[in-house]
Amino acid sequence: MARTTPLERYRNFGIMAHIDAGKTTTTERILFYTGVTHKIGEVHEGTTVMDWMEQERERGITITSAATTAFWRDHRLNIIDTPGHVDFTIEVERSLRVLDGACAVFDAVQGVQPQSETVWRQADKYEVPRICFINKMDRVGADYFHAVDTIREKLGARPLPLHVPIGAEDKFRGMVDLLKMKGITFDDETMGAKYQEVEIPADLAAQAKEYRAKLEETVAEIDDELMAKYLDGKPLSNDELMRGIRRGTLEMKFFPVLCGTAFKNKGVQQILDAVVDFLPSPVDIPAMKGVDAKGNDVVRKTSDAEPFSALAFKIMNDPFVGNLTFFRVYSGRLEAGSYVYNSTKDKKERIGRLLQMHANKREEIKEVYAGDIAAAVGLRASTTGDTLCAEDAPVILERMEFPEPVIHIAIEPKTKGDQDKMGVALQRLQMEDPSFRVHTDEETGQTIIGGMGELHLEILVDRMFREFKVEANVGKPQVAYRETITRTVEAEGRYIRQTGGRGQYGHCWLRLHPQEPGKGFEFENAIVGGVIPKEFISPIQKGIEEAMTSGVLAGYPMVDLKVELFDGSYHDVDSSEMAFKIAGSMGFKEGAAKASPVLLEPIMAVEVTTPDDYMGDVIGDLNSRRGKIHAMNPRAGVQVIEAHVPLAEMFGYATDLRSKTQGRATYSMQFAHYAQVPASIAETIVTKAKGVAAGAK
């Protein structure tokens, strides 16, 4: 089967935003207008196509990125709807990794919100060109130009307004298109599917003219030819402007901004036009870089003629077909039933079937080409971030990195019968979600699950019950504390057992240095003159790393320190790898205890939006939680309070905030950094941790 759509007409893009900015609604409208669905799904009715997991429909939030294919103006759109809740940031990171462009949706009342900043930074990291959609123009307090300003102020980005709204709040009727210099209004009878171009309303004529002039000036800046024409006072033609906007968007010099209200069906077709006109096709993005089996750099161009290469970016367990592996094809082509080589795991796997996904409906296809996003059935070993490629042309594309959990919960099956099922369920969920970790506490024997927040773990436990019929009891959330050292010390590790027969001899001197926060662990071999033979250096490092998993204060992992191995001795006969590993571990423990160890805790960046009347209560409450308030901004009748608060103090905050503000305040939080725990509180934590450890023995 030959390719039906040329590569230049592909658009792989994601819809990204803060929770509640209206991403899923926008996607639903896109599916409606592109003719994929015949009835619009509503989030508040729980009938959306993209939010197909049961919990998503109940909670009205998007958890997994559903991938959908649609068509507009003879272009093939592969759309990925991403979650906006901070606990699911990993999903956003995964989808951005495989997208070429994105549409960032903002709330016209709030403008840029905290999660919008996080997602925007992730898109910057992967250099994803974006267009912006200011949604919810029909809401009370909607202010398009304020929202545009927040893109400039909070994201440090350069917005390029292509629209001026006609009316706002309940008077919002449409927008002025600054390229065509026409007004656009929508028919309510056809659910916005039909719209008219009208003359620009007289009261907006001056403003439209002003913004058109700004548009021409901004676009002219990126092209010498256009700049010369602009400086000569000649007007730029629409074609020239379109070309310039496309170029500036692809180079991320600026970000086109549109407006509308997806819920009221106004402005969605304009998003689709902008996706086609301004976002990149797979041909416009740089060739994919990777390494071959020998570690040499390899480049894969976006072409069907190149060897096959793809990146698995999501694993999902489907009740009907089992494991689905979502992947993005970067080069070459692949037929259903053929074999692929997983170069990350060094395994050959057979692709059973290939599916084109439309949210949770699927269409079987025979072949995929460069630029496609599809799902494969039958891959057993592949997990998120793995490279799939042709066996005769192996390549490893750059891997994704996933954050460490900030919260842990003990979990146990309700009955003996649930025991085995729980193990299988946790393993499956871990395959799907790399930011979800499972381990067994060696001292207590409990199963501990870790994730990015309370909601994250709550939903995973809920999925265990719904999808795997496993009932489990869940403990209280535990904070992922860490330990570190605060001064440089030297320590000796001696492990010498010489009593008849072959003995054990390991001896080393270590220097421990504190590192700046977030720097991690560093090991330096400063041995000179072979006082310790080369083959024993690695065991010493291994011993140190094992000792670091259980700190000297309360048994929490140690971070942000450097260990320098600078002296020691060995015995010709009695020295062994094991002896030096034990010596390394002993030396580290002794040094860490002397190096003024301290406890670290995760600090969260919290943003609370509250009506003015409750501001005092909210601030007082944050202060009582050891919060540090660092900004307060008035915004459309509400106050936005930004603070840093220890995670340990944030459990149950949602309920407290609701009761303090009669449910009128909202908040969002995300991990900011680790910081030292105050001495008085650290003492309690250490005593408690030691008590638990003693009780387990």
From Swiss-Prot:
Do you know which Gene3D superfamilies this protein is assigned to? 3.30.230.10, 3.30.70.240, Elongation Factor G (Translational Gtpase), domain 3, P-loop containing nucleotide triphosphate hydrolases, Translation factors
Question: Which CDD domains does the annotation name?
Answer: EF-G (cd01886), EFG_III (cd16262), EFG_mtEFG1_IV (cd01434), EFG_mtEFG_C (cd03713), EFG_mtEFG_II (cd04088)
Q: Which residues form the tr-type G domain?
A: 8-283
**SMART domains attached here?**
EFG_C (SM00838), EFG_IV (SM00889)
Pfam families according to UniProt: EF-G_D2, EFG_C, EFG_III, EFG_IV, GTP_EFTU
Enumerate the subcellular locations listed in this protein's record, separating them with semicolons. Answer: Cytoplasm
Asked if the Swiss-Prot or TrEMBL record annotates the protein with the keyword Protein biosynthesis, the reply is yes
- GO CC list: cytoplasm
Instruction: Name the keywords, alphabetized.
Output: Cytoplasm, Elongation factor, GTP-binding, Nucleotide-binding, Protein biosynthesis
Determine the domain of life of the protein's source: Bacteria
GO molecular function terms here? GTP binding; GTPase activity; translation elongation factor activity
Q: What does this protein do?
A: Catalyzes the GTP-dependent ribosomal translocation step during translation elongation. During this step, the ribosome changes from the pre-translocational (PRE) to the post-translocational (POST) state as the newly formed A-site-bound peptidyl-tRNA and P-site-bound deacylated tRNA move to the P and E sites, respectively. Catalyzes the coordinated movement of the two tRNA molecules, the mRNA and conformational changes in the ribosome.
Q: Which PANTHER family match?
A: RIBOSOME-RELEASING FACTOR 2, MITOCHONDRIAL, TRANSLATION ELONGATION FACTOR G-RELATED
Q: Hey, which family's this protein in?
A: Belongs to the TRAFAC class translation factor GTPase superfamily. Classic translation factor GTPase family. EF-G/EF-2 subfamily.
Q: Which NCBIfam families match?
A: EF-G (TIGR00484), PRK12740.1-3 (NF009379), PRK12740.1-5 (NF009381), small_GTP (TIGR00231)
Q: Spell out the protein name for this chain.
A: Elongation factor G 1
Q: Which gene encodes it?
A: fusA1
